[in-house]
């Protein structure tokens, strides 16, 4: 029995979840998201909760049980609260700004980097050294944050680059004379 999959997903007030076969649709104050699950997983609504169960006792069904439950949980949480990833920029002259539908990054290259902001994602720069990526889809928020970080990841000697807010960079000592 899956320790995660056996727990039903509570649906908060203000969120409606529609189950149609293997497709789920959640509507909330932040928008609408849909999810399609594999055939080995059965989904149903019971007492205002989404219950996820394996259809068969095959290995594949058991492997995907908790995964499907977590995807449903993220779907419900996304339309109700949303997800946010914060990035920090360290380095002399390194900065970020939002111009129209682009995120403009100056990261020590000879040119500035223009990153087009995808649909469904909101990017804010409260300070030139902090970037906040938010949206309803957890996977898309994480992917956009990872793409921004990949432009110049943190280096281990001085810590310059783009890093996640709570990320710990293991520092190295420079060469000795």
Swiss-Prot record:
The keyword RNA-binding appears for this protein: yes
GO cellular component, one term: cytosolic large ribosomal subunit
GO BP of this protein: cytoplasmic translation
Alphabetical list of InterPro entries matching this protein: Ribosomal_uL6-like, Ribosomal_uL6-like_a/b-dom_sf, Ribosomal_uL6_a/b-dom, Ribosomal_uL6_bac-type, Ribosomal_uL6_CS
Cited SUPFAM superfamilies: Ribosomal protein L6
Membrane-spanning residues: none
MF terms (GO), sorted A to Z: rRNA binding; structural constituent of ribosome
Source taxon at top rank: Bacteria
Keyword Ribosomal protein: yes
Alphabetical UniProt keywords: Ribonucleoprotein, Ribosomal protein, RNA-binding, rRNA-binding
Family: Belongs to the universal ribosomal protein uL6 family.
Protein function: This protein binds to the 23S rRNA, and is important in its secondary structure. It is located near the subunit interface in the base of the L7/L12 stalk, and near the tRNA binding site of the peptidyltransferase center.
NCBIfam families: L6_bact
Subunit text: Part of the 50S ribosomal subunit.
Listed name of the protein: Large ribosomal subunit protein uL6
Organism: Rhodospirillum centenum (strain ATCC 51521 / SW)
Gene: rplF
């Amino acid at each position: 029995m899956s320790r995660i999959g056996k727990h039903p997903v509570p649906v908060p007030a203000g969120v409606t979840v529609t189950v149609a076969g293997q497709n789920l649709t959640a509507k909330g104050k932040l928008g609408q998201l849909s999810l399609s699950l594999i055939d080995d997983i059965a989904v149903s609504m019971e007492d205002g909760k989404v219950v996820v169960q394996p259809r068969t006792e095959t290995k594949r069904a058991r492997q995907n049980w908790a995964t499907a439950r977590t995807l449903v949980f993220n779907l419900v949480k996304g339309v109700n609260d949303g997800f946010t990833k914060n990035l920090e920029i360290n380095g002399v002259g390194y900065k970020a700004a939002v111009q129209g539908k682009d995120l403009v990054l100056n990261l020590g290259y000879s040119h500035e980097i223009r990153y087009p902001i995808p649909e469904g994602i909101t990017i804010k720069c409260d300070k030139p050294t902090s970037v906040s990526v938010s949206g309803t889809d957890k996977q898309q928020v994480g992917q956009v944050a990872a793409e921004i970080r990949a432009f110049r990841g943190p280096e281990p000697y001085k810590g310059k680059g783009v890093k996640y807010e709570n990320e710990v960079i293991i520092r190295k000592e420079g060469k000795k004379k």
